[in-house]
């Protein structure tokens, strides 16, 4: 049996092929561009992630028996905002973890909702890297894109969806979105019940 590990990083996707004894059979890295459309902004095209991941998988398995692949594991950059429309198409470039445009939205979350309340529910306070401030930024600055949102995903979850057809995330990444009630392990209505900025 063989297993694939996919790490969707900020500058490249790293892929590893391992056998059932934990021996590394192959390692591949594929780079993709990072865009800075304005000072302090950081974006990527999710299609670039997908294309380089697929190329990486082909390269990773070129000398392996593909029928022996028993599982795939996903990891990668956290907190980036990938928004999809009703047809699961990407609406705009992903806003990454290292993007600093959401200072006002973070101030709103920390001051109006409150750091204590945020911390109680999400085990975090709001920072510019997290997902919820990015959603609020899109709502305020790109209302036409906000109106089209049907699904919100994180970068590695988008790649997992493209490879499996399943929309999902994990508790660790969900907690950094500021949308997840960590204590009760469910999505929080905290932002939905608070006044909008």
Description of each model-found segment:
Residues 41, 49-50, 97, 137, ...:
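Signature tryptophan residues that serve as conserved aromatic anchors
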Residues 1-92, 120, 148:
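N-terminal glycine/serine-rich phosphate-binding loop of ATP-dependent small-molecule kinases
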Residues 192-197:
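Conserved small/polar residues in nucleotide/adenosyl-binding loops
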Residues 138, 159:
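Polyanionic/metal-chelating signatures
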Residues 98-137, 181-185:
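Glycine-rich phosphate-binding loop plus the immediately following alpha-helix
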Residues 67-69, 116-126, 145-153:
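A short alpha-helix-loop-beta-strand transition element characteristic
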Residues 61-97, 125-129, 160-181:
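Short beta-strand-loop/turn "lid" adjacent to the catalytic site in phosphate-handling enzymes
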